[in-house]
Amino acid sequence: MKWYLWGAVVLLYSLFGSACSTEGRYDLSAYGLSPVENVDNAPAMARALEQIREKCEENQTIVVTLPKGRYEFYPDSAAERVYFISNHDQMNPKKVGLPFEGMKNMVFDGQGSELIFHGRMLPVSLLDSRNCVLKNFSIDFKHPQISQVKVVENDTVNGGITFEVAPWVHYEIRDSVFVAKGEGWELTPGSGIAFEGDTRHLVYNTSDIPVGVRGLIEVSPRLIKSPRWKDNRLVPGTVIAMRSWERPAPGVFLYHDVNTTLENIKVHYAEGMGLLAQMSENITLDGFSVCLKGADDPRYFTTQADATHFSACKGAIISKNGLYEGMMDDAINVHGTYLKVVRRVNDSTLVGRYMHPQSYGFEWGRVGDSVQFIHSSTMELIGARNRITEGRRSSRSGLRIR
């Protein structure tokens, strides 16, 4: 009798354990995604992720696989989202290629796929999700907004630089001005980053440099003379990534996530940061890289700004086994966001304001969070810590906090 009772207990435990650790597997090819050239996968991806999200359960692991291939995404039919992203231009709505939202215990495995984006898009977003892993894929754009050129001649006596435009750059000389063109966008570069042609290192003692994109003479297709461009540091063979200051979206965006792992992901280009994470807890980057495609990659650049950027995150931030190169700013940047006190309502209520045009609209703090006042001119602490009991938006860039 005792043996049978013990056997029944073991059987019930096994069944219960199995129910709590089941795994749901979803192959995205069954949802219409196709690695065929020029096929737009954006609408199929949006529909698939919405359907899969509805199947997420607390005690189930969801595994979403994308058969290895080259998948293209276009903005016209992509999911539209209003996202306010720290340290980026607040241009909305944004077109999102892979919108992961409200996911629980999910693993997305790209199985080595290349994700190619067109126009201006936010490639990957993960919002309001817990215990998720994104892995094994790369991100790139068909037509980057950065225009790469190579110095052919630098007349240091009379002035003027002649440069050659890289073969993949779409441009025109319009009224003697260089205009870069792409799918749904065009711009005139305002600055550049100079790289040594042979080493790909930054040219010594340079950061952002002025570029000569006006008063141009097109000597022949892709060979352009800029008579007014004077910079003795730019010797023949120097490669310059000419860019604007626009920063519409990162390659990967995390917001209000808990326990996120990004594994074996390569961001080859994004018009903003490679990764922007905000208001999230416990992030592990394992083999997450913002990098070129290898030693033979003709490009010298990757992202317009930081490789990785963490705004108002908490818990552990781990970055290992990654490579950050070719970006226009920091490899890793971790910070919070200050509000300026613009009005004292009463002894327990104030109005604070975001003071930077790339920092507003997103959540600043939640009820229960601690707040420390700081003297802006000296950075000295003022008084003891306080705790938020109520908060609401009072304007586009202002918050009323109690």
Language model features by range: what are they?
Residues M1-G24:
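Bacterial Sec-dependent N-terminal signal peptides
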